[in-house]
């Protein structure tokens, strides 16, 4: 009994420490990717094309690394892979201190940071306790979201004092996360050293066995990300509000999401699989209605209310969807499978802004992008609603 309690304490301690490390790495990413490089064209001579490329290449590096990181963790072990990741992130952001507006360093650092964060995410997802997956995934996504947003906001404020003087803080945050890592005990599932050919075959096998999940993984990210390029223009030209009021809408949505992730996500663990299916289906339907509603509304107070509901729904839909995915994963292939899933999700997040921007540009109508995003969620609701009904019929005697 004592051994069991000690094991649970150690497991919980490791989980909390990994949450802190994830928060710090996302904090550094928020500072650099969401704030620092976006402000560079306004305070230095660096071109917008350079910073835009750095932004895109960061997520390409992240997605590409996710595809193979699970296999690298199994082959070389978590210590070597994570230490290499922290080293790459620290060196790249340390170089920014000395070359704050160098195009090469800006792009190089964006790539290295994308690579470095990948193994932390895969280990984090693999270490979640299956008995409390909904609740713990709420904590994971809360740490991710909080890290990104707080890092971005703090860097935005610091840039107002001086555009580059506080760049050292990004490397410092990574260094703190690196030190904390040595106080964590990480256990991988089914550690092995398969040859490259066998690993490639396993990637194909993992992909083929989870094809039913790919539409949801890819298209959810694409549908949400498609709105990113048009939301500022929608706020200022359609709703006709200031950037401050637009920021308030984002904050309200973030608060709703945080509340849902921390307090509502745990209900996924305490209810049946049918309840989880209902949350996912309802989430897709509500997203369809709410996103479509944004295309017809010009009252900022209603927009704030919709933002709150979207945040609340996102905070419970994400853990529910994650629990649904986890039910399809072989326990001995968690790192490999989560890596492939994260990679597919990353590609969805990359193509979303591109498609959303092109739709708006060629149709010259912001509403068409809202329609596109809403239709994706409607298609997901129909697809997975049908799948859930079939699954429930199959398990009934």
UniProtKB/Swiss-Prot annotation:
An annotated Gene Ontology molecular function: antiporter activity
Pathway terms, separated by semicolons: Cell wall biogenesis; lipoteichoic acid biosynthesis
Primary site of residence: membrane
A GO cellular component annotation in the UniProt record: plasma membrane
Cellular location(s): Cell membrane
Superkingdom in the source lineage: Bacteria
Pfam families: MFS_1
GO biological process: lipid transport; lipoteichoic acid biosynthetic process
UniProt keywords, alphabetically: Antiport, Cell membrane, Lipid transport, Membrane, Transmembrane, Transmembrane helix, Transport, Virulence
Transmembrane segments: 15-34, 46-73, 80-99, 105-126, 138-159, 165-184, 211-231, 243-263, 275-294, 300-320, 340-363, 369-389
Gene3D superfamilies xref list: MFS general substrate transporter like domains
Keyword Membrane in record: yes
Record's bilayer topology term: Multi-pass membrane protein
Function description: Proton-coupled antiporter flippase that catalyzes the translocation, from the inner to the outer leaflet of the cell membrane, of the lipid-linked disaccharide (anchor-LLD) that anchors lipoteichoic acids (LTA) to the cell membrane.
Family affiliation: Belongs to the major facilitator superfamily. LtaA family.
PANTHER family recorded: AUTOPHAGY-RELATED PROTEIN 22 (PTHR23519:SF1)
Protein name: Proton-coupled antiporter flippase LtaA
Species this protein is from: Staphylococcus epidermidis (strain ATCC 35984 / DSM 28319 / BCRC 17069 / CCUG 31568 / BM 3577 / RP62A)
Source organism phylogeny: Bacteria, Bacillati, Bacillota, Bacilli, Bacillales
């Amino acid at each position: 009994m004592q051994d069991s309690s000690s094991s649970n304490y150690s497991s919980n301690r490791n989980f909390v420490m990994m949450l802190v490390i994830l928060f710090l790495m996302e904090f550094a990413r928020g500072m650099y990717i969401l704030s620092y490089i976006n402000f560079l064209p306004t305070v230095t001579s660096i071109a917008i094309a350079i910073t835009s490329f750095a932004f895109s290449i960061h997520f390409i590096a992240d997605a590409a690394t996710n595809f193979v990181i699970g296999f690298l963790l199994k082959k070389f072990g978590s210590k070597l892979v994570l230490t290499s990741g922290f080293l790459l992130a620290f060196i790249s952001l340390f170089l920014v201190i000395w070359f704050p507006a160098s195009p090469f360093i800006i792009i190089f650092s964006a790539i290295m940071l994308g690579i470095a964060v990948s193994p932390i995410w895969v280990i984090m997802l693999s270490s979640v306790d299956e008995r409390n997956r909904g609740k713990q995934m709420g904590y994971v996504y809360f740490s991710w979201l909080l890290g990104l947003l707080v890092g971005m906001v703090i860097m935005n404020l610091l840039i107002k004092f001086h555009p580059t003087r506080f760049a050292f803080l990004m490397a410092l945050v990574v260094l703190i996360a690196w030190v904390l890592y040595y106080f964590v005990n990480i256990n991988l599932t089914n550690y092995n050293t398969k040859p490259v050919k066998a690993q490639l075959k396993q990637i194909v096998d993992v992909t083929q066995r989870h094809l039913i999940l790919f539409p949801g993984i890819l298209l959810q990210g694409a549908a949400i990300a498609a709105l990113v390029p048009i939301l500022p223009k929608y706020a200022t030209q359609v709703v006709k509000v200031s950037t401050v009021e637009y920021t308030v809408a984002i904050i309200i949505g973030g608060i709703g999401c945080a509340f849902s992730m921390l307090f509502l996500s745990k209900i996924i663990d305490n209810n049946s699989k049918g309840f989880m299916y209902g949350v996912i289906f309802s989430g897709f339907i509500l997203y369809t209605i709410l996103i479509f509603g944004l295309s017809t509304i010009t009252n900022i107070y209603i927009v704030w209310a919709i933002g709150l509901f979207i945040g609340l729904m996102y905070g419970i839909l994400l853990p529910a969807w994650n629990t649904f995915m986890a039910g399809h994963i072989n326990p001995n292939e968690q790192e490999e499978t989560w890596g492939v899933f994260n990679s597919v999700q990353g590609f969805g997040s990359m193509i979303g802004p591109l498609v959303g921007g092109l739709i708006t540009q060629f149709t010259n109508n912001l509403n068409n992008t809202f329609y596109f995003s809403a239709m994706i969620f409607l298609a997901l609701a129909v697809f997975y609603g049908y799948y859930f009904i079939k699954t429930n019929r199959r398990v009934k005697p």
